[in-house]
């Protein structure tokens, strides 16, 4: 087993539809018994969310185990603090097996928080949550403005879930001295970003991929989720592709609008992901059409 100071992990991050899964599978094929994959995806973490999340199929998942895919069901809610806790434990276990963790995905906030750390915030207060649920969203936002104006400025006045959580955190005094949870500072982190040189190249890839995500199978999947789980206020309601599917089922949009709205939302997601990448420090960026260069880079960096 490597000494702690020599431990290396890999980040492979990039916008949607850039072939990140194909890259790590190729690496696993070319360097057997070397890497273990940790998924960094806030939707693929959930069981039953398969079509709309672009989750690798069962055959791929059986052959190449992905940690943190199908990790919990929609009766539960995942967040960045749980991701950091789960991932740091996984990384230690992977090192114990003598392998290299490779974190791959497009949930940039998870990557960033793992690197930079977050405050060890208090858990939810059930009694307080029940009290707050009695208010409508406008009243809740007024409460937040009165109790913590600075926080209210950064939150959409219609985002009920975030408003409630902000009030909870403020009342639980998260601003007192708290430990910061993050990656071990002694780890060597090799960060690889995939980004298009031309936006049109990514839009083309999105257009090719989107019919496989936004189709009748997605509608059936969304209907199944609504029947199986209580998800009225679950974050999955806002996830790209699922949001549009739920809107279609509930009559908020029609069939002719559905596909175009998923396509637009996916492009907007990719735009936000690229914005993250452009401001990322210590990131080795590769064009989406230069996948072979990533392997050459890793061979050199890891001395494979």
Q: What does each model-found stretch correspond to?
A:
Residues 1-304:
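Phosphate/pyrophosphate-binding catalytic cores of soluble transferases and nucleic-acid-acting enzymes
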């Amino acid at each position: 087993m490597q000494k702690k100071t020599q431990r290396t992990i890999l980040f492979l991050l990039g916008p949607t539809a850039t072939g990140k899964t194909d890259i790590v599978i190729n690496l696993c094929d070319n360097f057997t018994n070397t890497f273990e994959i940790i998924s960094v995806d806030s939707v693929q973490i959930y069981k039953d969310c398969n079509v709309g999340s672009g989750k690798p199929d069962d055959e791929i998942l059986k052959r190449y185990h992905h940690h943190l895919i199908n990790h919990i069901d929609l009766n539960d809610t995942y967040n960045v603090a749980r991701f950091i806790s789960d991932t740091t434990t996984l990384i230690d276990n992977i090192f114990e097996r003598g392998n290299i963790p490779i974190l791959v995905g497009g949930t940039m906030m998870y990557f960033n928080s793992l690197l930079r750390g977050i405050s060890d915030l208090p858990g939810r207060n059930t009694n307080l949550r029940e009290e707050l649920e009695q208010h409508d969203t406008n009243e809740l936002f007024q409460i937040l403005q009165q109790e913590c104006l600075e926080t209210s400025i950064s939150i959409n006045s219609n985002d009920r879930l975030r408003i409630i959580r902000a009030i909870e955190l403020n009342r639980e005094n998260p601003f007192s001295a708290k430990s910061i949870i993050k990656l071990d500072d002694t780890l060597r982190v090799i960060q690889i970003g995939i980004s298009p040189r031309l936006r049109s190249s990514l839009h083309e890839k999105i257009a090719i991929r989107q019919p496989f995500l936004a189709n009748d199978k997605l509608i059936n999947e969304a209907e199944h989720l609504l029947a199986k789980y209580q998800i009225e206020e679950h974050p999955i309601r806002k996830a790209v592709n699922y949001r549009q599917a739920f809107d279609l089922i509930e009559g908020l949009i029609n069939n002719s609008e559905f596909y175009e709205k998923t396509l637009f939302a996916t492009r907007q997601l990719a735009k936000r992901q690229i914005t993250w990448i452009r401001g990322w420090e210590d990131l080795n960026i590769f064009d989406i059409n230069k996948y072979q260069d990533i392997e050459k880079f890793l061979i050199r960096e890891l001395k494979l």
